[in-house]
């Protein structure tokens, strides 16, 4: 009889990585969507399902009524805080301002993740409801896999083997949401000329007029990698084109994106918001993240939303406008919704600490190789996923966050350090057990976005289990080891981030302008 004394699983709901000792799945939430039996044309609405109807637009807004502020219990007595809007002085406020819940729907599944503003293109100060504004939202690669748009930027408009997305897997609906105060929600009701209702602070989710596109994926991002499979970091950026003449797109721009831009600039703007440190410098920091996992709503609460309605299945999938619309309201009995959530540590302190060896016989050390909570992903051959049907091996470096366990839907959350700089992106949780029964640790996992070149110099005089083959990389601005990075897209499309690169005097941000760097589209 085979007895496994110690084991762990790294879980989320987006993908699975399986070996004898580990199960990895990402913290995105995915639900199957039944294949529709009855087809409707694009003018059909279900008037019997709604107490009143929105005549203003064919895009939709969800308002999920507030559950009571409380401490939720998830997964073997792990606790976290939900349903809150941080005060201006709260260390979580910057993350709140930048962060959104994302919902991708196809005819085959309904998936949720978390994203945050990384860049934009257009006049953020405009008061004119005309033209387009582009917002760029960072998230996980496995969350971005839920976006399958036949009108996407090349090469993302097809699978890796150039197969076109079929109608069941193509994204037909997208919305972006945020936990919002009741004053702003009341204003939205007035703008929509809807029946006034008493509302609390609630999750507000708004459908965009266009299906998003893919700006960047961290696939095959490293030079000189010795790997059987192509490599990935769990990071991607999606592009939202907002038509400011459209009421709902204007609401997204005015209520979500503009406040996020103000916060982004207050944090130092593009060239000051992202941390790059030697690996051991992460050890002494606390790390702060909040996201939008999909959780069970309070039983005494209703969810007010606009109904997803299906257009005719013969609709032209090449057009960029959305194929589903939420254009009627109803009270839904949905038991789970995205809920703004932050970690609640067992010791009552805020923020997450790096996992470190607590005893010489730590059970964690026996099942996962790490150096004081710093992980080298290429040491784990089962850390892999499929993006658009192609399998990738995870590479790069990450943080193990002690006593951290946010459920599915939180994937893509930005992680801030003590200096209010973003150092990594959250993608899953490692649940460690002893004797296959007793829960021992909840360890959140994140992918570092930038690593210091100084590590390579240190590596010449030191060899450890995790750093004997260290390769620095920079997924945002690029460096000599990184062949695919976001700034390539920013340069090609002349976004705000590239404007900041041009105006910076620091060489570390200028790599995109050296050696005629290719765009990431050629490097998938």
Curated annotation (Swiss-Prot):
Membrane topology: Lipid-anchor
Chain residues carrying a lipid of type S-diacylglycerol cysteine: 27
Region Disordered: start-end pairs: 37-68
Keywords: Cell membrane, Lipoprotein, Membrane, Palmitate, Signal
Cross-referenced SUPFAM superfamilies: Trypsin-like serine proteases (SSF50494)
Biased composition (Polar residues): 58-68
Flavoprotein keyword on record: no
GO cellular component, as recorded: plasma membrane
Localization in the cell: Cell membrane
Signal peptide span: 1-26
Family: Belongs to the MG067/MG068/MG395 family.
Name recorded for this polypeptide: Uncharacterized lipoprotein MG395
Organism of origin: Mycoplasma genitalium (strain ATCC 33530 / DSM 19775 / NCTC 10195 / G37) (Mycoplasmoides genitalium)
């Amino acid at each position: 009889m085979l007895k496994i004394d110690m084991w762990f699983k790294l879980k989320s709901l987006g993908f699975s990585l399986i070996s004898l000792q580990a199960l990895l799945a990402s913290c995105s939430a995915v639900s199957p969507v039944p294949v529709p039996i009855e087809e409707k044309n694009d003018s059909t609405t279900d008037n019997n399902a709604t107490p009143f109807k929105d005549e203003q637009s064919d895009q939709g807004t969800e308002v999920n009524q507030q559950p009571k502020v409380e401490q939720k219990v998830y997964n073997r007595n792990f606790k976290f805080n939900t349903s809150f809007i941080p005060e201006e002085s709260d260390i979580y406020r910057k993350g709140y301002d930048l962060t959104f819940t994302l919902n991708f729907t196809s005819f085959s599944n309904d998936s949720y993740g978390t994203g945050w503003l990384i860049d934009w293109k257009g006049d953020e100060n405009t008061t004119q409801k005309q033209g387009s504004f582009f917002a760029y939202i960072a998230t996980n690669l496995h969350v971005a896999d839920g976006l399958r748009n036949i009108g996407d930027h090349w090469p993302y408009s097809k699978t890796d083997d150039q197969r076109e997305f079929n109608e069941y897997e193509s994204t037909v609906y997208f919305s972006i949401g945020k936990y919002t105060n009741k004053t702003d929600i009341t204003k939205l009701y007035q703008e929509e000329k809807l029946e006034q209702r008493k509302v609390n602070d609630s999750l507000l989710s708004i459908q965009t007029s266009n299906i998003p596109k893919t700006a960047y994926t961290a696939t095959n991002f490293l030079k000189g990698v010795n790997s059987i499979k192509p490599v990935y970091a769990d990071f991607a950026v999606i592009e939202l084109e907002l038509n400011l003449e459209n009421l709902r797109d204007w609401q997204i721009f005015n209520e979500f994106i503009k406040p996020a831009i103000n916060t982004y600039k207050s944090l130092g703007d593009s060239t000051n918001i992202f941390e790059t440190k030697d690996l051991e410098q992460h050890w002494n920091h606390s790390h702060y993240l909040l996201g939008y996992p999909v959780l069970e709503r309070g039983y005494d609460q209703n969810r007010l939303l606009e109904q997803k309605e299906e257009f005719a299945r013969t609709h032209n999938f090449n057009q960029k406008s959305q194929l589903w619309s939420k254009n009627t309201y109803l009270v839904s009995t949905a038991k789970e919704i995205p809920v703004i959530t932050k970690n609640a540590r067992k010791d009552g302190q805020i923020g997450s600490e790096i996992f470190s060896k607590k005893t010489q016989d730590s059970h964690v050390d026996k099942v996962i190789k790490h150096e004081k909570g710093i992980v080298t992903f290429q040491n784990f051959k089962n850390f892999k996923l499929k993006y658009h049907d192609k399998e990738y091996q995870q590479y790069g470096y990450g943080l193990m966050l002690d006593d951290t366990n946010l459920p599915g839907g939180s994937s893509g959350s930005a992680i801030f350090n003590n200096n209010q700089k973003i150092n990594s992106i959250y993608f899953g949780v490692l649940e460690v057990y002893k004797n296959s029964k007793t829960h021992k640790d909840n360890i959140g996992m994140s992918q570092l976005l930038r690593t210091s070149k100084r590590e390579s110099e240190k590596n010449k005089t030191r060899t450890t289990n995790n750093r004997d083959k260290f390769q620095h990389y920079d997924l945002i601005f690029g460096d000599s080891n990184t062949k695919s990075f976001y700034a390539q897209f920013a340069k090609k499309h002349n976004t705000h981030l590239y404007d900041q690169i041009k105006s910076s005097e620091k060489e570390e941000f200028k790599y995109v302008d050296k050696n005629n760097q290719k765009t990431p589209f050629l490097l998938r």
